[in-house]
């Protein structure tokens, strides 16, 4: 009888191990670099920082031969395909601009919203033209909106399309105003941390300086 109890105990212990769930990451960062081919990761390997791409290549997981069949290869379609896992006929983004109801429209243009942080036309943007959910949207749904999803980029489409419909905040750069903005699709006013960043006027500072390469110019190919 003792042997039977011992056997049951051991089996239960193994069951507990088998059902143990891996610890979920607290932060997921998605980075898309325009026009950076996959082979550049290795071509310029010696120039990466130890805690950046080198760490990802050394400790991360590489998904190779992953192809999404679409054309043309433009920014808006690329972001939409990567972050939705679908193609233009499914996610609805057919270009940086495309014909909708007989008119050429910006892929993220939306006249039903208002700019926040600017008075210019750069703020009339939202993800309404995107027909499906993104990774960020699914993360929000899976956690009952407890997850925080934020999109930031210089281009509006590069910030809006990856973040999706249910992001907590999406910010892009208005090159006319010289600051980061958003639209009423997401919020009615900019967070204080965005206002503080804008007040630093870094764009003006950088434009007044001479552009220098990180390494000697003759070492670039």
Locations of regions flagged by a protein language model:
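A generic fold-level signal
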Residues: 23-25, 74
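Short, structured active-site-proximal loop/turn typified by the sulfatase FGly-forming signature C/S-X-P-X-R
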Residues: 41-90, 148-152
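Beta-strand elements within well-structured catalytic alpha/beta cores of enzymes
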Residues: 26-37, 56, 82, 139
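Stable alpha-helical elements in mature extracytoplasmic
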Residues: 32, 37, 49-53, 78-79, ...
């Amino acid at each position: 009888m003792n042997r039977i109890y011992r056997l049951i105990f051991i089996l239960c212990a193994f069951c507990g191990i088998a059902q143990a769930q891996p610890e979920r990451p607290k932060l997921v960062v998605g980075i898309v670099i325009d026009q950076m081919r996959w082979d550049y990761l290795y071509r310029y390997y010696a120039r990466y920082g130890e805690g950046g791409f080198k760490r990802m290549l050394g400790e991360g997981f590489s998904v190779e031969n992953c192809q999404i069949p679409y054309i043309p290869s433009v920014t808006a379609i690329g972001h939409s395909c990567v972050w939705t896992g679908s193609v233009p006929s499914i996610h609805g983004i057919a270009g940086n601009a495309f014909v909708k109801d007989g008119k050429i429209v910006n892929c993220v243009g939306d006249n039903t919203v208002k700019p926040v942080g600017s008075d210019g036309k750069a703020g009339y943007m939202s993800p309404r033209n995107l027909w499906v959910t993104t990774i960020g949207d699914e993360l929000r749904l899976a956690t009952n909106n407890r997850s925080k999803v934020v999109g930031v980029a210089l281009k509006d489409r590069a910030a809006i399309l990856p973040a999706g419909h249910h992001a907590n905040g999406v910010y892009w750069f208005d090159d006319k105003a010289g600051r980061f903005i958003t639209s009423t699709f997401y919020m009615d006013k900019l967070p204080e941390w965005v206002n503080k960043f804008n007040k630093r006027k870094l764009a003006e500072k950088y434009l007044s300086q001479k552009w220098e390469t990180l390494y000697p110019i003759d070492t670039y190919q």
